[in-house]
């Protein structure tokens, strides 16, 4: 039941020093995780030694450049399209590290933005509503009335002149001067409309829920515990650990040989 770090293992340098010629391990990890969060899938192509098939390079690629598919026999493959050249290659599933966000089929992940689309659309609508509301000096629309009838051209002219003088923050608190016989009746804002404007404030909580990040880390809400250590443990177990577990499982299965797995070897990431 003892555990030992294999510092001289051929994968040690690849994982902790240089995964490929262009990137450090931290850059490769951040790039891959960014693709998971924004695209639902993080991919790294495994370049193997032509003689012993040992992984020689790990190359992160954009989530949109790879598409999983099954052949007629039911075997899983990955179709890779080079973003620079347009060249297409079919890759064996064991030559692609595939990390997923939430998935409905276990093959393709769904991005946070896709799952949050409805809420984001509502928040954007609330933002546009609020901008329009305050561009009108935070005043609801109203009705100008006059005892006599006006032609359409005359109505448009009166409306345009009124909005020019009284709309906008810069025209706040200006005194309205009405022509003889003209009256202005404001239309009060409903409680429902007021709540819709305030709804924009809950989007911070939405972001917290979508990404699984505690509210206090986004500058809102309170910490769950008085101890920073306990809050750190909660963040690791609730937010980080689900991803780390997936990384370790995928890395161990595809980077180690079957003979190594049978001897109890596995790849563990530091947290």
Residue spans of the language-model regions?
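A beta-strand-loop signature enriched in Asp, Gly, Thr, and Trp
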Residues: 185-261
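Basic, alpha-helical terminal appendages of large translation-related enzymes
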Residues: 260, 264-271
């Amino acid at each position: 039941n003892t555990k030992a770090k294999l510092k001289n293992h051929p994968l040690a340098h690849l994982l902790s020093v240089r995964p490929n010629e262009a990137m450090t391990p931290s850059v490769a990890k951040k790039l891959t995780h960014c693709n998971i969060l924004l695209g639902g899938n993080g991919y790294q192509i495994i370049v193997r030694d032509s003689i012993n098939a040992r992984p020689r390079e790990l190359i992160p690629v954009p989530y949109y450049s790879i598409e999983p598919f099954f052949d007629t026999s039911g075997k899983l493959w990955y179709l890779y399209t080079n973003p620079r050249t347009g060249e297409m290659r079919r890759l064996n599933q064991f030559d692609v590290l595939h990390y997923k966000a939430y998935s409905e089929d276990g093959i393709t992940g769904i991005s946070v933005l896709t799952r949050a689309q409805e809420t984001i659309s509502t928040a954007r609508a609330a933002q546009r509503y609020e901008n329009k509301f305050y561009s009108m000096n935070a005043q609801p629309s109203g009705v100008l009335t006059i005892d006599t009838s006006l032609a359409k051209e005359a109505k448009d002219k009166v409306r345009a002149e009124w909005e020019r003088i009284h709309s906008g923050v810069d025209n706040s608190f200006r005194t309205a001067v009405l022509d003889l016989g003209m009256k202005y009746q404001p239309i009060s804002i409903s409680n429902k409309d007021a709540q819709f404007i305030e709804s924009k404030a809950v989007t911070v909580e939405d972001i917290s829920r979508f990404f699984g990040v505690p509210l206090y880390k986004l500058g809102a809400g309170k910490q769950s515990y008085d101890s920073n250590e306990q809050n750190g443990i909660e963040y690791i177990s609730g937010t980080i650990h689900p991803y780390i577990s997936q990384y370790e499982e995928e890395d161990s299965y595809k980077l180690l040989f079957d003979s190594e797995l049978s001897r109890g070897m596995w790849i563990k990431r530091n947290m």
